[in-house]
């Protein structure tokens, strides 16, 4: 007798047992098999690149600063009439008359008011000044600080309690007989005292604050905006001031928080959609600040 195939069934299809069966709508399969074209449907041209983080672009607001202490000029000088004491000196510009107050071991209070914490040991001094540029300030003889009156522990304790070793307050004096109510405009300079490799104390500015029209501002350096003059009288800011991207337009945009002024506003607006890294230091960028600088001719 021959072989009989009952029910008209087809011979078994010998497939690779390692591959999943073809989809069958009548099969009671629990679960889903991955599609070989699933990733191609999502990324037809390969893996999608992550989007660049949006960087905010802002324009700077000009604030009038009537008094400016040049922090790079601040130093301690020996008191020739009082051996062992040191006097604070610095250079400043003032467009209006005002007063300068020097405090030792002072902390900042409300509305940028300074509070002397050791007034009995280190009395504060105050002097008035007229308006003018490149004025030099130096404490009067006998009013300086004697380092033998303090210890290393005093300096460390001050740092841990938000007390600055030295604080300089440059304050505007009202030109009329009826000064405005509230705290007058002022600039506060906070200084710490540190020993150098010779064991001598040096003064170092750590913070400068502006109080203008009831608002508090912290001053920060911007790299690439300084106006310097070389030995030949040439403005160094005129050389190499071009945008580092297009190499043609002047720099007017600062990268924050690294504070590199390195781009023009046009390149900055385009670059913020392509990368969020500073072109100079490659640090992440939070904001772009457009600053208009007016370089007036020096007299």
Swiss-Prot record:
Q: Any idea what job this protein has?
A: Acts as an E3 ubiquitin-protein ligase, or as part of E3 complex, which accepts ubiquitin from specific E2 ubiquitin-conjugating enzymes and then transfers it to substrates (in vitro).
Q: Which domain of life is it from?
A: Eukaryota
Instruction: Name the gene behind this protein.
Output: LUL2
Q: What is its EC number?
A: 2.3.2.27
Q: Where is the lipid attached (N-myristoyl glycine)?
A: 2
First and last residues of each zinc finger (RING-type)? 243-282
Q: Which InterPro entries match?
A: LOG2-like_mRING_C3HC5, MGRN1/RNF157-like, Znf_RING, Znf_RING/FYVE/PHD
Instruction: Name any one Pfam family assigned in the record.
Output: zf-C3HC4_3
Give the record's GO biological process terms: protein ubiquitination
Provide the residue span(s) of the region labelled Disordered: 1-33
Q: Give the domain section of the comments.
A: The RING-type zinc finger domain mediates binding to an E2 ubiquitin-conjugating enzyme.
Top EC class of this enzyme? transferase
Please give the name of this protein.
Probable E3 ubiquitin-protein ligase LUL2
- CDD domains per the record? mRING-HC-C3HC5_MGRN1-like
Q: Which reaction does it catalyse?
A: S-ubiquitinyl-[E2 ubiquitin-conjugating enzyme]-L-cysteine + [acceptor protein]-L-lysine = [E2 ubiquitin-conjugating enzyme]-L-cysteine + N(6)-ubiquitinyl-[acceptor protein]-L-lysine
Pathway listed for it is: Protein modification; protein ubiquitination
User: What's the family?
Assistant: Belongs to the RING-type zinc finger family. LOG2 subfamily.
- GO function terms (MF aspect): ubiquitin protein ligase activity; ubiquitin-protein transferase activity; zinc ion binding
Keyword check for Lipoprotein: yes
Q: Where is this region: DAR2 domain?
A: 90-208
Q: Which UniProt keywords are listed?
A: Lipoprotein, Metal-binding, Myristate, Transferase, Ubl conjugation pathway, Zinc, Zinc-finger
């Amino acid at each position: 007798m021959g072989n009989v195939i009952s029910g008209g069934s087809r011979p078994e299809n010998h497939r690779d047992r390692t591959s999943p069966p073809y989809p069958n709508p009548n099969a009671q399969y629990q679960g889903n098999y991955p599609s070989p074209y699933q990733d191609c449907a999502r990324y037809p041209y390969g893996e999608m690149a992550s989007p660049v983080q949006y960087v905010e672009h802002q324009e700077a607001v000009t604030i009038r600063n009537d008094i400016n202490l040049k922090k790079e000029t601040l130093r301690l000088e020996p008191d020739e009439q009082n051996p062992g004491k040191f006097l604070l000196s610095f250079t400043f510009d003032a467009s209006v008359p005002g007063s300068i107050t020097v405090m030792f071991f002072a902390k900042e209070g409300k509305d940028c008011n300074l509070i002397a914490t050791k007034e009995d040991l280190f009395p504060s001094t105050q002097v008035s000044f007229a308006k003018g540029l490149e004025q030099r300030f130096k404490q009067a003889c006998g009013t300086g600080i004697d380092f033998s009156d303090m210890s290393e522990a005093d300096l460390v304790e001050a740092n841990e309690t938000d007390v600055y070793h030295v604080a300089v307050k440059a304050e505007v004096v009202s030109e009329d007989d009826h000064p405005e109510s509230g705290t007058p405009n002022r600039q506060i300079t906070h200084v710490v005292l540190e020993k150098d490799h010779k064991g001598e104390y040096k003064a170092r500015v750590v913070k400068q604050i502006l109080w203008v029209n009831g608002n508090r501002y912290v001053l920060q350096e911007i790299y690439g905006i300084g106006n310097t003059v070389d030995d030949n009288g040439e403005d160094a800011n005129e050389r190499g001031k071009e945008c580092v991207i297009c190499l043609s337009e002047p720099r007017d945009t600062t990268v924050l928080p690294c504070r590199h002024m390195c781009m023009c506003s046009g390149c900055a607006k385009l670059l913020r959609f392509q990368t969020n890294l500073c072109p100079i230091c490659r640090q992440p960028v939070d904001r772009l600040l457009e600053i208009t600088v007016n370089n007036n001719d020096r007299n």
